[in-house]
């Protein structure tokens, strides 16, 4: 600790310096009021704690000095010291912000506990600051998270013979005291009818967390809304257009930021699913009758994430959604779930996703989606997923 002391007893000053110096504390003891005030008001301001007598030269003057010191060192705890007969002065100092006080017994036994007392005050102040910062962090994260979640659709529509459900879930971190904080993130999904026959399904994921990721995904959401009226029936052209526009947005690509996107169009008459991936996971199909489950492509079928380079070309992939089957599109937070202490021993992964879907084969899609998130969370052994997760699950009836 860096300790500044204003003391009025030279003999005690030497002993205090000896006791506090045992733990290699950086201690400056001032034997005169003038020296103490010079150090406190004009000298170095980076003290961990200040200890001062509240009796000298007299209690009123000491209080005035204390107020000056408090004004100069708002973040530094000040501890007072007084003899037993002077304790009735303590209340005034405590009311004005003094953190604690020490009774100076005539035998000097107080010096044996001096370091412990000062250290406990410093630790208490640091803990309070950490709690304050943690609470401010929670408030800021919550406000950004609510802003981000405001663009998530709540009422989804599906064409005849289809059902659709979706879910977004933020990642979590733990801050002071182990309390979980739900992070503001950059995940996003949308489901809407392009026309009477074509249903759009998309999931997006902006890199990072916090305000930048949130604003990146809101920028993409705005662009999607602006150009969806063009009614692109070519998913690759749509994704390329979004990419070119995002590359013009500094909020997205500053500091290497980017967005992954899976954009698909389902034709409800032909049951054809046309999709384009910009760095997003490959869609999964689960045929309920046979329990066959598979990805619709490989990692090579995904293009470059959005916002990295303009003029990029993207590929169109076309698949038929079989009767009595389910189609899953998702962001990588679902698969990249792992226990914090077992990062190198695997993740929930595509295998975990497929096993969860198969286990929910006979359940309604809402239950299957709930089970998917539950199983992914369970894999983390309580630590929570470290990335946001967006999932859209589509069910085709016979």
Report the location of each language-model feature.
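Two-component/phosphorelay signaling modules centered on CheY-like receiver
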Residues: 7-34
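Short acidic, S/G/P-rich loop/turn micro-motifs used as interaction or catalytic elements
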Residues: 9-12, 54-60, 85, 107-109, ...
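Acidic, metal-coordinating helix/loop segments flanking the phosphotransfer/catalytic sites
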Residues: 29-49, 53, 57-59
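Conserved acidic residues
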Residues: 48-49, 99, 325, 332
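CheY-like receiver
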Residues: 60-129
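… and, occasionally, acidic/histidine-rich disordered N-termini of signaling adaptors
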Residues: 132-326, 382-398
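Active-site-proximal, acidic helix/loop segment immediately C-terminal to a metal-coordinating Asp/Glu
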Residues: 211-231, 321-384
């Amino acid at each position: 600790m860096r300790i500044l002391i204003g003391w009025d007893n030279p003999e005690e000053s030497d002993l205090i310096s000896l006791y506090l110096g045992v733990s290699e504390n950086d201690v400056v003891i001032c034997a005169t009021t003038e020296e103490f005030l010079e150090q406190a008001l004009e000298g170095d301001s980076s003290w961990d704690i200040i200890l001062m007598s509240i009796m000298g030269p007299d209690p009123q003057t000491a209080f005035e000095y204390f107020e000056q010191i408090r004004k100069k060192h708002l973040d530094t705890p000040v501890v007072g010291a007084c003899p037993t007969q002077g304790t009735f002065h303590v209340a005034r100092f405590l009311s004005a912000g003094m953190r604690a006080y020490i009774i100076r017994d005539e035998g000097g036994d107080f010096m044996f506990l001096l370091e412990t007392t000062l250290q406990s005050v410093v630790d208490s102040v640091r803990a309070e600051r950490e709690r304050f910062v943690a609470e401010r962090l929670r408030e800021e994260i919550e406000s950004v998270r609510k802003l981000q979640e405001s663009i998530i659709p709540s009422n989804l529509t599906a064409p005849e013979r289809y059902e659709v459900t979706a879910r977004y879930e933020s990642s979590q971190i733990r801050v002071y005291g182990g309390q979980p904080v739900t992070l503001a993130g950059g995940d996003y999904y949308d489901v809407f009818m392009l026309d009477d026959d074509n249903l759009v399904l998309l999931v997006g994921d902006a890199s990072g967390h916090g305000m930048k990721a949130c604003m990146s995904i809101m920028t993409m959401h705005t662009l999607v809304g602006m150009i969806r009226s063009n009614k692109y029936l070519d998913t690759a052209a749509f994704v390329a257009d979004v990419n070119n526009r995002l590359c013009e947005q500094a909020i997205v690509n500053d500091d290497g930021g980017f967005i992954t996107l899976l954009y698909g169009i389902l034709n409800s008459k032909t049951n054809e699913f046309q999709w384009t991936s910009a760095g997003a996971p490959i869609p999964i199909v689960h045929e309920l009758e046979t329990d066959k489950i598979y990805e619709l492509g490989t990692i090579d079928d995904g293009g470059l994430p959005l916002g990295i380079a303009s003029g990029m070309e993207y590929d169109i992939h076309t698949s038929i959604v079989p009767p009595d089957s389910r189609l899953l599109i998702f962001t990588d937070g679902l698969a990249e779930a792992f226990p914090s202490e077992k990062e190198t021993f695997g993740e929930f992964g595509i295998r975990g996703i497929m096993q969860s879907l198969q286990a929910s084969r006979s359940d309604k899609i809402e239950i299957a989606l709930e089970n998917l998130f539950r199983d992914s969370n369970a894999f983390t052994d309580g630590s929570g997923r470290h990335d946001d997760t967006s999932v859209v699950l589509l069910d085709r009836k016979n």
